Amino acid sequence: VARAEEALRQTAITQPAVLATDEGLTRMLAAYGIKPDFAMGHSLGEYGALVAAEGLPFADALEAVSARGREMTRFSPDDKGLMAAVFAPIHEIERVLKTISGYVVIANINSNRQAVIGGASDAVRRAMESLVRAGYEVTVLPVSHAFHTSIVASASEPLRRVLQRLHVAEPRLPVVANTNGEFYP
């Protein structure tokens, strides 16, 4: 079991497994007559949302997320970075990050009082300590790399080549874009 759990923490395995779970749940709900009025997913989940909305075939989405995980695993920088969820007003997170030496950024803004920071391990640790001292809740995320940061930027070009081959169609349902919370045009 421990070996299986460790394997699932590896992004090359996790990403296709998450998409397959999304698709399985969508199909199970459909079998019970439950169909979505719109679809949305965060980060990797946006692929599942596009599949659920019939804008992207499952096989293409699987190819994309497999490439995404594979490319992020293929390169191995000395520091794969850290990520942490921070429960604090965004302006406070920004204020603290400006005081930290090293590379640490807001990687995701999930609400006006919760974001994810990511970057170089030491800088993220220092930011976490400062945020905790300021009275905010901070939780390290169990991820293999500091996603949504420049640490994984070298994976973007090979992934872009895969994405260009996909068969993307107009979704049959409205899909919320995870970059801005708006419906796709």
Regions found by a protein language model. Name each.
Residues L97-I100, V124-A134:
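Short amphipathic alpha-helices in soluble, non-transmembrane regions
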Residues I90, G119-V124:
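Helix N-cap motif at beta-to-alpha junctions
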Residues F87-I90, S101-I106, Q114, L159-V162:
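Phosphate/diphosphate-binding loops
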Residues A107-R113, L141-V143:
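RNA-recognition motif
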Residues G41-S43, I109, A120:
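Conserved alpha/beta-hydrolase "nucleophile elbow" surrounding the catalytic nucleophile
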Residues A85, V132-P185:
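Acyltransferase
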Residues V1-I13, Y103-V105, I109-N110, T179-E182:
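Acyltransferase loading domain of fatty acid and polyketide assembly lines
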Residues V1-T99, E137-A146, S150-V152, P171-R172:
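FabD-like malonyl-/acyl-CoA
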